[in-house]
């Protein structure tokens, strides 16, 4: 979801809020506003649209979480041929990759985790109705270890459940891609859950730690992104196992193994090999690398040889100018020199 679209949603809700103040009819106005907004959001499945209409306060948070996932995806792949861009259908989760590749696996995992993270944070901050701090982490005292639950523990289970209900609702086709997407959604949420942190505060006389009050907090989303990038690098190719009677996809097993071994719950899985992402290709969703910045001297993925797929690169020269060697003179002005530097950038042909 683009930032301008998110702002549009916010301003529409704001306008309906002003209308409510003037008319004094909250329920009907909110319902009308939710219907208008939810019908305008591209790519929503019927169940997602129903959730949007019943929980209009949550749709902005969902959008923030989806955008957080997209931003993290772009950060993790900023130096690769594929930079988290696609030519697929526009949805609240960005443009979808048409190929069931390891890149698609990452995008599903990171956006599912992003929605769970954003919803959990909004609940802890009191920005969503029907949720708050984790009630199960209140009042317990561990006398042996000298600590008790206190403060506001993030209710990550609520965030995960909400992400599961909303994000997974777009999987309506009964095929192998559905099983792949659902597995990767769950893997992203599981990585988030496993990285929850315990923070404690000491209580006692003169700085001693007679007792501790502890609570759980969300990890930084960058940490989740790094972990999922590692999962992407070790992604597992799978194939579908079909039921004997209806021949419908039943579960996924690791490909090239004789046994029916299922992937681990935190594995990212894919069913199709990745394209090379060198050229624009509507069939795969690849946008190609033409015009991408590259590093002429790097031997890595961001190097011009790799990034440009052997097509060569263009050199662009420009002069960078800035204020430098600034000194304060009494009294009272600052005098600076003007420095300049000739700079080159390289883009793929």
Swiss-Prot record:
PTM statement from Swiss-Prot or TrEMBL: Palmitoleoylation is required for efficient binding to frizzled receptors. Depalmitoleoylation leads to Wnt signaling pathway inhibition.
Region (Disordered linker), start-end ranges: 238-266
Highest taxon listed in the record's lineage: Eukaryota
Signal sequence annotation: 1-24
A GO cellular component entry from the record: extracellular region
GO MF annotation, one: frizzled binding
BP terms from Gene Ontology: anatomical structure regression; angiogenesis; apoptotic process involved in blood vessel morphogenesis; canonical Wnt signaling pathway; cell population proliferation; cell proliferation in forebrain; central nervous system vasculogenesis; chemoattraction of dopaminergic neuron axon
Keyword presence, Glycoprotein: yes
Disulfide bonds: 73-84, 123-131, 133-152, 200-214, 202-209, 278-309, 294-304, 308-348, 324-339, 326-336, 331-332
Lipidation (O-palmitoleoyl serine): 206
Any Pfam family the entry gives: wnt
Keyword vocabulary terms for this entry: Developmental protein, Disulfide bond, Extracellular matrix, Glycoprotein, Lipoprotein, Secreted, Signal, Wnt signaling pathway
Subcellular location as annotated: Secreted, Extracellular space, Extracellular matrix; Secreted
Keyword Protease: no
Glycosylation: residue positions: 83, 127, 295
Subunit composition and interactions: Forms a soluble 1:1 complex with AFM; this prevents oligomerization and is required for prolonged biological activity. The complex with AFM may represent the physiological form in body fluids. Interacts with FZD1 and FZD10. Interacts with FZD4 (in vitro). Interacts with PORCN. Interacts with glypican GPC3. Interacts (via intrinsically disordered linker region) with RECK; interaction with RECK confers ligand selectivity for Wnt7 in brain endothelial cells and allows these cells to selectively respond to Wnt7.
Family: Belongs to the Wnt family.
Domain topic, free-text comment: The intrinsically disordered linker region is required for recognition by RECK in brain endothelial cells.
Functional note: Ligand for members of the frizzled family of seven transmembrane receptors that functions in the canonical Wnt/beta-catenin signaling pathway. Required for normal fusion of the chorion and the allantois during placenta development. Required for central nervous system (CNS) angiogenesis and blood-brain barrier regulation.
Listed name of the protein: Protein Wnt-7b
Organism per entry: Mus musculus
């Amino acid at each position: 979801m683009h930032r301008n679209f998110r702002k549009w949603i916010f301003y529409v809700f704001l306008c309906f809020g002003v209308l409510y103040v003037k008319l004094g009819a909250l329920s009907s106005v909110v319902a009308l506003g939710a219907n208008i907004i939810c019908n305008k959001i591209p790519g929503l499945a019927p169940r997602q649209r129903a959730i949007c209409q019943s929980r209009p306060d949550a749709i902005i948070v969902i959008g923030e979480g989806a955008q957080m996932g997209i931003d993290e995806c772009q950060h993790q792949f900023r130096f690769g041929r594929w930079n988290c861009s696609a030519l697929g259908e526009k949805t609240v989760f960005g443009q979808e990759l048409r190929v069931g590749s390891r890149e698609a696996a990452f995008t599903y995992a990171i956006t599912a985790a992003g929605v769970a993270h954003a919803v959990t944070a909004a609940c802890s901050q009191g920005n969503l109705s029907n949720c708050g701090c984790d009630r199960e982490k209140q009042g317990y005292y561990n006398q042996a270890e000298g600590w008790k639950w206190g403060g506001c523990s993030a209710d990550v289970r609520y965030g995960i459940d909400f992400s599961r209900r909303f994000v997974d609702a777009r999987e309506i086709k009964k095929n192998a891609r559905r099983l792949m997407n659902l597995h990767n959604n769950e893997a992203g949420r599981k990585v988030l859950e496993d990285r929850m942190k315990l923070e404690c505060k000491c209580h006692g006389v003169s700085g001693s730690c007679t007792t501790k009050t502890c609570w759980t907090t969300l990890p930084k989303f960058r940490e989740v992104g790094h972990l999922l990038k590692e999962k992407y690098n070790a992604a597992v190719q799978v194939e579908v196992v079909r039921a004997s009677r209806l021949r419908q996809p039943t579960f996924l097993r690791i490909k090239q193994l004789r046994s029916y071994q299922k992937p681990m719950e935190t594995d990212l899985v894919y069913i199709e090999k990745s394209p090379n992402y060198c050229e624009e290709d509507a069939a795969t969703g690849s946008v190609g690398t033409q015009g991408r910045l590259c590093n002429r001297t790097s031997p890595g993925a961001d190097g011009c040889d790799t990034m440009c797929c052997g097509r060569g690169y263009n050199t662009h020269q420009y002069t960078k100018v800035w204020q430098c060697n600034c000194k304060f003179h009494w009294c009272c002005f600052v005098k600076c020199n003007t420095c300049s530097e000739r700079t080159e950038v390289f883009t793929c042909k």
